[in-house]
Amino acid sequence: MRPLSDRLFPSKKIHSHSAAIINVCIQEVFMISLNINGKAYQVDVAPDVPLLWVIRERLKLTGTKFGCGIGLCGSCTVHIDGKAERSCQTPVGSAQGRKITTIEGIPENHPVKQAWIKKQVPQCGYCQPGQIMQAASLLAEDPHPSEAKVIEHMNGNLCRCGTYTKIKSAIRLASEGGNK
């Protein structure tokens, strides 16, 4: 395949240094098909753009938060094919054809959301969408996890307010069917 600069400017003779800069600065854009919260979307975007930015900026689903941008805090957690994934580290091209669920796609009557309300988990609330997504994926995988498994599974989701005790309590409540 010819360099992008040759395809953009076929009749121009471009110095090789300038051509290299053009090729680095201009990314090819593709039409990407996404299934988010059961709805089909088509976005024209470079395939290496993080899924987080497509979700927030292009599709205006702003429940998924930007925290660290390097996959360490968990604020950007979404479900991809039922598994918790960091959307800031997921290239949108790799999400094509997969089932994506954001916090907006989790029903209000979901046991985890209801437990979060009953246990009054949020303080500032910024990390809560990611915490809920991580907890929901845990309970989908293991409906009655041990405390050790809860701690292990939730370990990568950070909370500046330190509501970890309430988070664990809410997960326990959700795993018991919300009966406490």
Spans of model-derived segments:
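Generic alpha-helix initiation/capping and coil-helix boundary signal
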Residues: 12-13, 128
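Short, Lys/Arg-enriched N-terminal segments with co-localized hydrophobic residues
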Residues: 13-30
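Signature of N-terminal electron-transfer/Fe-S-associated modules in redox systems
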Residues: 25-180
